[in-house]
Amino acid sequence: MMLINTTRITFLALAVSLGQLAVADPGPADVRVVKFDLSAERERIHAPRNEAAIAQIPAGFRFAQPGKFTVAVSGVSSPPLALLANDDKTTIGSEADTAQLIADSLGLQLNVVQSSWEDWPLGVSSGKYDAVISNVTVTEARKKRFDFATYRQDVLGFYVKSSSPIQAINAAPDIAGLKIIVGSGTNQEKVLLAWNQANEQAGRKPALLQYYDDNASAQLAVQSGRSDATFGPNATSAYSAALTGGTRRVGVVNGGWPLQADIAVTTRKGNGLITPIHTALQGVIEGGQYTQVLQRWGLDVERIDRSQINPPGLPD
């Protein structure tokens, strides 16, 4: 573990309000233990056929497997996004459930394929996979090769010990003097460095950033009081908090801060499939099945109200 007092670090000012959040946080999360059903037999949430989406599938379109929507999902050790069920072979999680909704809407069977992160770009480009649904962030570089339909916000979360007196971390003043665990070289570290600069300029004490090599050590530091909070990807922290009840969320920031970062279904560029996928997503958003999936996996705060095709991506 390495500790750095960020008063010694110079960080260029960003031309945005340092206290402005891009995500509307519903407030501190309730402390409750959730028992997730990780059985392979658990029924996925389903959606009705969406005739409008089906009609948008290009005439003669060749799916990777006839009659099936073949989706690559990577990182099956990343709950609640993707993990293996209790049979050690079935992919479950919010990503597979989202894929099921799209497959149902398009009148297709779902075929989930476990893929490495390095494999999916070639797999999608070659037609091995119809799409990848694996926490892929829209970037301008990726938009040159792929089409996107958004389905979640990229969200970072502040989590504290469940009994902590800290109720909210929403802006730079809220981190003043706190000890916060963060990953080195990450966008969340960039957020904290910028907020520390704002605090120093306002005469407030900066936060002390702490770096741990593994999550278990980080959680122990929070529970023992050596750290006040963790700041990282919301999904994994939300899952841990729900399982143990030992931590709770007190604030969120968009993962692309100070820009907007979106998570999207990814397809080969220009093959025409992204339009029916977008229509399918909008249908399940309006129909409520999408919300059911997010609630099942504790990801309500990452919800979107409208899917977008190829929105502005993070810069190259």
Region spans (language model):
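Flexible hinge/capping segments at coil-to-helix
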Residues: 162-180
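Beta->alpha turn/N-cap motifs
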Residues: 72-78, 113-118, 127-139, 161-162, ...
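Extracytoplasmic small-molecule ligand-binding "clamshell" domains
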Residues: 27-135
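A ligand-binding cleft/hinge motif common to bilobed small-molecule-binding domains
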Residues: 119, 136-143, 191-195, 200, ...
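Ligand-binding clefts/hinges and TM-proximal coupling segments of bilobed small-molecule sensing domains
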Residues: 37-53, 187-202, 282-316
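Periplasmic-binding protein-like
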Residues: 153-160, 242-282, 299-316
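Short helices/loops that flank or line small-molecule/ion binding pockets
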Residues: 101-105, 113-114, 118-131, 145, ...
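Ligand-binding cleft/hinge of the Venus flytrap
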Residues: 84-86, 99-106, 188-211, 241-245
